[in-house]
Amino acid sequence: MDTTSPTETHDGVADGADALSEILMSDDVSGSLWSAVDSGRIEVLVPELPALRMEQDPIHRHKDVLSHTIAVVAKTPDDMIVRLAALFHDIAKPRTRSFEHGGVTFRHHEVVGSRMTRKRMTELGYDDEIVEEVSELVRLSGRFKGYAEGWSDSAVRRYARDAGPLLGRLNALIRSDCTTRNKQKAADLQASIDDLERRIADLAEEERRAAERPQIDGQAVMTHLGTGGGRHIGDILRMLLEVKRTEGELPDDELYARIDQWWQAHAESYGDV
């Protein structure tokens, strides 16, 4: 029976976090992980992982979930947070497996996996911030499902809002979680993520523009011109906003001069105001 503690490797390395990070950041991460699996080292560091070897993976067509997990880790960018999330993203599948309608399901495995990830990484000695980021990525790792069937703009906004500062890493994890050998399916998935990222950027730009305000408000424009409200005030405010977008913020006296020039050129078209 192996009596080595969870934070101690067979090589005598006392810090489990450093030991696992060394494996994940090696030049050949796939080879390093399989070596750690075969030697029993990974069972000391992350006892939940070997159970994935016995869990069939009907979705990704690997012989088991562990093979899929290591393939995902190998596809990730050189980012410790993303690689840790990839390592743990399916950790709860054995615990959540059920058989329904002749098939296998892993309902809510991301939520359960997030809790398991937090517990294991804390025991390994990772900093709290890293633990929170990785466990949150695991929790969010299934959020992209269903995008190809069509998401509303509100669903896209919710996805981006829930991911927050982890958005880039979440998308990197989702890209890496495609290990199919079907080139068309792989290309379709990458195209879907490209489309999601484009929509997020477009919606963010729309919201930024909607929140923009000219430096001078409508009341100040009316006071300066000595007029009441009307269509001309809205047009002047749009002109001032375009000036702000193209030239940045300008001194107020320069903006009032622009208002005077604009009003001199357009006043007649508004009749009596």
Segments (PLM) and residue ranges:
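Short acidic alpha-helix initiation/capping motifs at coil-to-helix transition points
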Residues: 11-13, 24-27, 61-64, 108-115, ...
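Short coil/turn segments at secondary-structure boundaries
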Residues: 31-38, 46-52, 85-86, 97, ...
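Short, well-structured alpha-helical segments
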Residues: 33, 131-139, 233-241
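A general alpha-helix detector
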Residues: 15-19, 31-32, 68-71, 115-120, ...
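Divalent metal-dependent catalytic cores for phosphoryl transfer on phosphate-bearing substrates
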Residues: 70-187
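Acidic/His-rich, divalent-metal-binding segments that scaffold phosphate/diphosphate chemistry
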Residues: 2-107
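A glycine-rich phosphate-binding loop feature that marks nucleotide/adenosyl-phosphate handling sites
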Residues: 51-54, 90, 133-141, 154-156, ...
